[in-house]
């Protein structure tokens, strides 16, 4: 079916416009049961993976996931997940995205993100391979992909950030990394590996994310280690 898939905790919903009036006349719940909590850590950003599954991120605990096309409930922990577009299957995926954004590179490596550091993790070991042997302990499923959290924004900090950073009570509670007006990632999100051809060739394969609190788009060049 042609349409769009929406993540709206506790549901994942399929919408379609079948008569061309630009209004959805089909609404079908594919899955339900996800945790509802802080918006930035809710289920988000479904992206088609290179294996034909749709991947989505979440920073909260999952829940007991049900759906009309599932054979039974699927227990989901605090982890990202992947699912079939027809709602026939859903399962955990390696890693847990800390905020909005899901990114794949050209060879299928998946990157996760947190508000305080870009490209926090690369995910070299897919969970669906590791689960085949229940008698073997699961190793660490993520690898740190960046070793910095400082920023160098071109624009001046928002006035409210300056005011907040001058409040000693706020600084004492949250610490310098969260209260300095500029200089640290505090809202990194919306990551993407550039894989198109509109930008110059030198941009291909580079990593981008934004930090709205600092009016900044960050670019990093990825180098494989090993």
Regions found by a protein language model. Give the residues of each.
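Beta-propeller domains with acidic blade repeats across secreted/periplasmic ectodomains
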Residues: 1-226
């Amino acid at each position: 079916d042609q349409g769009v898939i929406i993540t709206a905790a506790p549901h994942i919903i399929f919408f379609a416009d079948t008569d061309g009036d630009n209004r959805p006349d089909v609404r079908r719940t594919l899955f339900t049961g996800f945790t509802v909590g802080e918006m930035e850590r809710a289920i988000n950003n479904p992206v088609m993976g290179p294996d034909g599954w749709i991947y989505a991120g979440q920073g909260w605990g999952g829940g007991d996931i049900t759906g009309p096309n599932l054979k039974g409930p699927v227990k989901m922990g605090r982890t990202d997940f992947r699912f079939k577009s027809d709602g026939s299957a859903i399962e955990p995926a390696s890693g847990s995205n800390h905020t909005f954004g899901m990114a794949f590179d050209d060879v299928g490596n998946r990157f996760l993100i947190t508000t305080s550091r870009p490209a926090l993790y690369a995910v070299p070991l897919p969970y669906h391979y590791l689960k085949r042997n229940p008698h073997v302990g699961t190793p660490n499923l993520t690898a740190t992909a960046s070793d910095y959290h400082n920023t160098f924004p071109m624009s001046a900090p928002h006035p409210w950030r300056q005011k907040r950073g001058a409040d000693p009570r706020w600084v004492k509670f949250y610490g310098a990394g969260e209260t300095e007006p500029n200089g640290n990632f505090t809202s990194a999100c919306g990551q993407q590996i550039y894989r198109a051809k509109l930008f110059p060739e030198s941009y291909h394969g580079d990593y981008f994310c934004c930090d709205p609190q600092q009016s900044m788009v960050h670019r990093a060049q990825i180098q494989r280690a090993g």
